[in-house]
Amino acid sequence: MRIREDLAGGRPLLFDGAMGTYYAARPGRGAERCEQANLDAPEEIAAIHRAYLEAGARAIRTNTFDVGGDWERARRIIEAGCAIALAAAEPFGAHVFADLGPAPQEGPLPPGEHYCRQAEVFLAQGLTHFILETLPGDEGLQELARYLKARCPEAFLLASFAVDPGGVTREGVSGRALLARAAALDEVDGVGFNCVSGPRHLLELVQGLDLSALGG
């Protein structure tokens, strides 16, 4: 697939920035959840996607980080988010990633089942690139990874963990240990860090990694 070809030569793949932060900064939008805007204000979400693409992003994420607990509503938000992102990315030839945030701690489903149910909706909309991001742990990751590759062998999956400047998640788990476990899964295509720490701390954390232990 093209994304693997794009990355094969070591070329960086520049993603967009946060959707929620950008959306909250728009007039009158500070207290609203951005995901609901896929249904209520799709033109605003499309405009944010385009702004990131015009700034040079070569990959954008669907506005689906936290789609809530009501499944019927969540499904409609995912479907709308896919349509908006695909339409925005097409003129730029950019990649679109299905964006999944952490599973609810007290949700009705185990994390793996939660992720797989969402993934099925993304696949039905034609998306094959996935990012599971801002994770405090890796519960459910293996289930999602194996499910995706069984359902869609060409699927591309990134897993990204949120750590503090000391390299620990909010669940008290070592980010390095999480990266190593995720990288050991054959069905996971890439691992990394995002959120919580600023760019300087994230750079220091990455520079301190033993990349050979991550398959790098």
Residue positions per predicted region:
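Domain-level signal for soluble alpha/beta catalytic cores
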Residues: 1-216
